[in-house]
Amino acid sequence: MPWLQVRLAISPEQAETYEDALLEVGAVSVTFMDAEDQPIFEPELNTTPLWTHTHLLALFEADTNAEMALAHLSLLTGEELPEHSAEVIEDQDWERSWMDNFQPMCFGKRLWIVPSWHAAPQPDAVNLLLDPGLAFGTGTHPTTALCLEWLDGQDLKGCNVLDFGCGSGILAIAALLLGAEQAVGTDIDVQALEASRDNAGRNKIAAERFPLYLPEDLPHQQADVLVANILAGPLVSLAPQLASLVRTGGRLALSGILAEQGEEVAAAYADSFDLDPIANRDGWVRITGRRR
């Protein structure tokens, strides 16, 4: 079924007003989009940032009178409408379109991330079946790729791994499939823990090999390998805690770090770890090292 799509160019200050007004005049969905490919990194706590130049897309039933809807919108907001357009678009199978764009990916020499609905390109490889589900972590982001490639290059046989900020569970599950004895996952988001649990089951990982915790419930036990793909700010503030969770001689991999933040994060760990050269990809970095 076709839809009427209305696009408006707004400022962040106008976002809430126009979202409410569009729903009031009959929009069935409202979506915010970046108008200038401007990234948002590490917002302040308790904020929901928008881009400096934002496009607001609203979908209406196809038989909606666009002129009347826009006139009503102007009345509700009490101001002249910003730059806008309206067009009828054909319906799409959005889920199928998204699934078609998520293809198997290889990381390092052994490891493949394979969508759960896709056949493994190399059945004899280490294939991690993944449904991105409710949380981040599919391998498409440079930070996830950097961590997966690092794990693929490690001898993990018999190791205990801690995935701090586990998201979809992709790093912990990869470690288990690559030979780790056990992986512990922790995340502040209960939905992330649920996604990790689902993805572990999809890969036939027994629950006792992949226990999951909220941070406040995480047992204090040292790991042979710790991976944390989160953000630079938390990595710096959590440095003493994360260092204490790695045994002497254990290995560390950190990412979620912008290139310009790399030296600051590395400095926070330099007293506890012998650090490797920083790895860089597409403006993001990975920091690795061994516990003294």
Curated annotation (Swiss-Prot):
Quote the catalytic activity from the record.
Answer: L-lysyl-[protein] + 3 S-adenosyl-L-methionine = N(6),N(6),N(6)-trimethyl-L-lysyl-[protein] + 3 S-adenosyl-L-homocysteine + 3 H(+)
Some GO term, biological process aspect, for this entry: which one?
methylation
Give binding positions for S-adenosyl-L-methionine: T144, G165, D187, N229
What UniProt keywords are attached to this protein's entry?
Answer: Cytoplasm, Methyltransferase, S-adenosyl-L-methionine, Transferase
Q: Which InterPro entries is this protein grouped with?
A: Ribosomal_L11_MeTrfase_PrmA, Ribosomal_PrmA_MeTrfase, SAM-dependent_MTases_sf
- GO molecular function: any one? protein-lysine N-methyltransferase activity
First-listed, main subcellular location of the protein, grouped into a coarse class: cytoplasm
Subcellular localization: Cytoplasm
Q: What does this protein do?
A: Methylates ribosomal protein L11.
Q: Which family does it belong to?
A: Belongs to the methyltransferase superfamily. PrmA family.
PANTHER family, A to Z: ELECTRON TRANSFER FLAVOPROTEIN BETA SUBUNIT LYSINE METHYLTRANSFERASE
What name does UniProt use for this protein? Ribosomal protein L11 methyltransferase
Which species expresses this protein natively? Pseudomonas savastanoi pv. phaseolicola (strain 1448A / Race 6) (Pseudomonas syringae pv. phaseolicola (strain 1448A / Race 6))
Q: Coding gene?
A: prmA
